[in-house]
Amino acid sequence: MDKNYNENLNYIEAWSVAVNALSGKKRENLLEDGFVSSAKGYKVCYITEIKNFTFRGLGFGEYNLSSSSKCEKKIKKCSITVNLNCDCGFYAFYDQSKAFNLAENYRGLVPIEVELYGKIIMHKDGMRGEEQDVIRVFLSRICSKGYCNREGIYLSKKVSLYNKKKKYLVRCEKHKSNENFMISEISKDKIDIVRY
């Protein structure tokens, strides 16, 4: 089977697992009033830029260490960024283990810890917020290449043959690409990096 097809299928599968767990389709899971103003959560993403720390979520677009959401669908009822009529915003799980389970099942995904601000809608398993700060990035200690179990010491650039999108993956010496960053040398003053 085509490698690009499998990569795209894994991406769609991971995205649907996350969306099904958190999406606005489960409106009956809202808490009493459904809104809070700040909360900590966990999610998964791809790292797309190292120097400026840019991430790509499983749903819409890219974001930085500190970002505000906007309606990607341009729905008239969605004049306020986060509301019950739209699915836009930054999603996060309450439970750290849900993000780590997704990352373990789909190599290349990176669990991160975030703080959501602004208008936040609370659901049974997670939340959706207006603004987001990435406060911690969790990087695997092992190489993300297939069944390799060597120590991952680099973040290596990989460009998808399917959609030409780039991401940085944890790689060992043997599987590193031409564009690499040593994990130990990445600036820790911008973000807390935790190895697991």
Describe each PLM feature range.
Residues 138-146, 167-170:
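Cys/His-enriched microdomains
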Residues 151-161, 180-186:
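Short Cys/His-rich "knuckle" micro-motifs
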Residues 1-88, 100, 104-125, 145:
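ADP-ribose/NAD+-binding catalytic cleft of ART/PARP-like enzymes
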Residues 187, 194-196:
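Long, low-complexity intrinsically disordered regions enriched in Ser/Thr/Pro/Gly
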Residues 130-136:
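Long, amphipathic alpha-helical segments that form or neighbor coiled-coils/leucine zippers used
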Residues 145-151, 175:
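Short Cys/His-rich metal-coordination motifs, predominantly Zn2+-binding knuckles/fingers
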Residues 162-179:
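Cysteine-rich micro-motifs
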